[in-house]
From Swiss-Prot:
Pathway recorded for this protein: Cofactor biosynthesis; iron-sulfur cluster biosynthesis
Protein induction: Suf operon is under both the Fe-dependent Fur repressor and the oxidative stress dependent OxyR activator.
Coiled-coil spans in chain: none
Active site: C364 (cysteine persulfide intermediate)
Top-level taxon in the UniProt lineage: Bacteria
UniProt keyword terms in alphabetical order: Cytoplasm, Hydrolase, Lyase, Pyridoxal phosphate, Transferase
Name used for this protein in its record: Cysteine desulfurase
Organism field: Escherichia coli (strain K12)
């Protein structure tokens, strides 16, 4: 299949609108991606003609809704090449998936004196749950430091592991710098020390294929809304043997086998014991449509187009005076920058006036901001529906802001 950005853009209704009298250039997909009509229509159709509560319903609508939900679990397992669909838990998103691991596996396996390793480039969602766990049990949080070019100081990693290391929690791709970490060697090293590995894949799965079996990670988590799917839905992958050992972290309906006031409660098997309550079935249906949409385009095709666009963007941005870029030359998805000494908020506001949507702030990565000694950055993210023309508009906009503000 030949990738056509024009055909892709035609599937996204929002891309035809104007902002401040100008065509929208949406360069904020790393925060949340726009949704194609196929996803919007699939979710709407479910609510119009197929909605019912899932699990245990004997009527047709309930049975069909349950089947559709479980088919999405199967589709998602194929998307990341899991061994079994029963290794996948539906969660609200990456943040909940990481918290689930911290509160279920973490509470059962991390003790006083143990340690967990993260990196200085992590999103707060892959920092705070581990800080909370370490504070609860008296464990130590160790940090892989950054290099100025936005890569990790991997030479320090062997010195951080010891016999008390229980987990390496690492991002696949930095949400600020676009750095893709060398997971294979990091995971191998962790396993050599008897540690488990959790990968935050929120910024990776939309850019190229992910194979959890090849990676050999123990946990992999991502969100639907960054993958052109709905908000409020995500996937947590856990190796089957680990998942079956993990206790539930939330109680309620759908996750039990039996409930007795005198004899207590027993749990149903994984993954369903981690899905208490009524699930976001509409969101799950929408996620399935997003996975189908991206798979039909071909992630390798998407990767090739996006990499060419990224190379073009980095080349063109060299023409902007006083522009500071953060991160390595080889990157995925995002370009973080500051213009002179102007605050990122001001630069982003000017760009919005030109119809260009970028993200400004600390990007839920305050330790990374502290490393670069800045309060905030602008971040332009490139998705499969962005164009060379939109990159040109960004460059022209930044040049114009530089002339106006000096």
């Amino acid at each position: 299949m030949i990738f056509s950005v024009d055909k892709v853009r035609a599937d996204f209704p929002v891309l035809s609108r104007e902002v401040n009298g100008l065509p929208l250039a949406y360069l904020d997909s790393a925060a949340s991606a726009q949704k194609p009509s196929q996803v919007i229509d699939a979710e709407a159709e479910f609510y119009r003609h197929g909605y019912a509560a899932v699990h245990r319903g004997i009527h047709t609508l309930s049975a069909q809704a349950t089947e559709k939900m479980e088919n999405v679990r199967k589709r998602a397992s194929l998307f990341i090449n899991a061994r079994s669909a029963e290794e996948l838990v539906f969660v609200r998103g990456t943040t909940e998936g990481i918290n689930l691991v911290a509160n279920s596996w973490g509470n059962s396996n991390v003790r006083a004196g143990d340690n967990i390793i993260i990196s200085q480039m992590e999103h707060h969602a892959n920092i705070v749950p581990w800080q909370m766990l370490c504070a609860r049990v008296g464990a130590e949080l160790r940090v892989i430091p950054l290099n100025p070019d936005g890569t990790l100081q991997l030479e320090t990693l062997p010195t951080l592991f010891d016999e008390k290391t229980r987990l390496l929690a690492i991002t696949h791709v930095s949400n600020v710098l676009g750095t893709e970490n060398p997971l294979a060697e990091m995971i191998t090293l962790a396993h050599q020390h008897g540690a488990k590995v959790l990968v935050d894949g929120a910024q990776a799965v939309m850019h190229h294929p992910v194979d959890v079996q090849a990676l050999d990670c123990d946990f992999y988590v991502f969100s639907g809304h960054k993958l052109y799917g709905p908000t409020g839905i995500g996937i947590l992958y856990v190796k089957e043997a680990l998942l079956q050992e993990m206790p539930p972290w939330e109680g309620g309906g759908s996750m039990i086998a039996t409930v007795s006031l005198s004899e207590g409660t027993t749990w149903t098997k994984a993954p369903w014991r981690f899905e208490a309550g009524t699930p976001n079935t509409g969101g799950i249906i929408g996620l399935g449509a997003a996975l189908e949409y991206v798979s039909a385009l071909g992630l390798n095709n998407i990767a090739e187009y996006e990499q060419n666009l990224m190379h073009y963007a980095l080349s063109q941005l060299e023409s902007v005076p006083d522009l500071t870029l953060y991160g390595p030359q080889n990157r995925l998805g995002v370009i973080a920058f500051n213009l002179g000494k102007h605050h990122a908020y001001d630069v982003g506001s000017f760009l919005d006036n030109y119809g260009i949507a970028v993200r400004t702030g600390h990007h839920c990565a305050m330790p990374l901001m502290a490393y670069y000694n800045v309060p905030a950055m602008c971040r332009a993210s490139l998705a499969m529906y962005n164009t060379h023309e939109e990159v040109d508009r960004l460059v022209t906009g930044l040049q114009r802001i530089h002339r106006l503000l000096g």
